[in-house]
Regions:
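Active-site catalytic motif of lipid deacylating hydrolases and related acyltransferases
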Residues: 29-88, 139
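Gly/Ala-rich beta-loop-alpha elbow adjacent to hydrolase catalytic centers
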Residues: 94-99, 103
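Flexible "cap/lid" loop of the alpha/beta hydrolase fold
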Residues: 108-156, 183-187
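Active-site nucleophile elbow and catalytic-triad environment of alpha/beta-hydrolase enzymes
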Residues: 174-195
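Short beta-strand/loop motif that positions the catalytic acidic residue
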Residues: 203-205
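Conserved loop-alpha-helix segment in the C-terminal half of the alpha/beta-hydrolase fold
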Residues: 207-232, 244, 252
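Post-His helix in hydrolase/transferase enzymes
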Residues: 239-255
Length: 259
């Protein structure tokens, strides 16, 4: 009987220990990173991070912006993996918009210590994201898609007013001129991994987003238990609110905010 009581006491002690460890893991400080890899979304290119990059470099971080070909999900994943393979040490992986799918797929790289989603898709492994998005209000920008030759882009009105609505019109039109044309099949792709299930995540919600439903963004951020900020921004908060986005990335990197 005494032996059984001792085993019961030991089991109870182990339960408390494991529970305490789990609680500590949930509140652990971010691992300090020295690299940041930025991944752009659809209708954009790597230069869309140009306002954020200097702020991160000023904090001493090594920054690389991926150039997605946007020809297929597999091609974009491979482009990001090539960049991740060049990183030396702890790395924060950041995705804007569609690139949330890319970082979810590639974020289990051993060097990746944190994920940052900026108004981004964040599907679960194998999830039909199109069906998920259909449960939320349809964003106006989707009405401006123009298809040709197996690729698509936003027309100028949708780009200026719905994609980049809080930028000066001249700036928005310049970005429209260099937008990346996407494969028609891109958005129907499915991830095989959901790195946010095993890596700490941060999420920037764009409250005035007309390209991705803000309600969908809030759902995704809550589902992944992300550290979340809400910004009164269009879909391109990385351009119109670079300081807020940079500070979110710095937090994920275990560094202090900049003013």
């Amino acid at each position: 009987m005494k032996i059984l009581q001792r085993f019961a006491a030991l089991a109870a002690a182990l339960t408390v220990t494991f529970a305490s460890q789990a609680a500590l893991a949930g509140t652990a400080a971010p691992i300090k990173a020295r690299n940041v890899v930025l991944v752009h979304g659809a209708y954009a290119d790597g230069s869309s991070w140009s306002e954020v990059i200097p702020l991160l470099q000023r904090a001493g971080l090594h920054v690389t912006s991926v150039q997605n070909p946007l020809t297929s999900f597999a091609d974009d994943v491979e482009a990001t993996r090539r960049v991740l393979a060049l990183q030396d040490g702890p790395t924060v992986l950041v995705g804007h918009s569609y690139a949330g799918m890319v970082i979810s797929e590639t974020g289990n790289d051993p060097n990746v210590t944190a994920l940052v989603y900026v108004a981004a898709r964040a599907p679960d492994a194998g999830e039909d994201y199109v069906a998920l998005a259909a449960r939320f209000p349809k964003p106006p920008a989707s009405n401006g898609l123009v298809h040709s030759g197996g690729f698509a882009q936003l027309n100028e009105e949708a780009f200026v007013h719905d994609f980049a609505g809080d930028l000066e019109p001249a700036r928005a039109r310049a970005l429209y001129a260099v937008q990346g044309r996407i494969s028609d099949a891109l958005f129907a792709s499915k991830t095989t991994q959901a790195a946010w299930r095993s890596k700490p995540a941060w999420y920037a919600i764009s409250n005035n987003d007309r390209t991705t439903s803000p309600e969908l963004e809030r759902f995704l951020a809550k589902r992944m238990n992300a550290t979340t900020v809400s910004i009164d921004s269009s879909h391109v908060s990385l351009i119109s609110h670079p300081r807020e986005i940079a500070n979110l990335i710095l937090a994920a990197a275990g560094l202090d905010e900049q003013r």
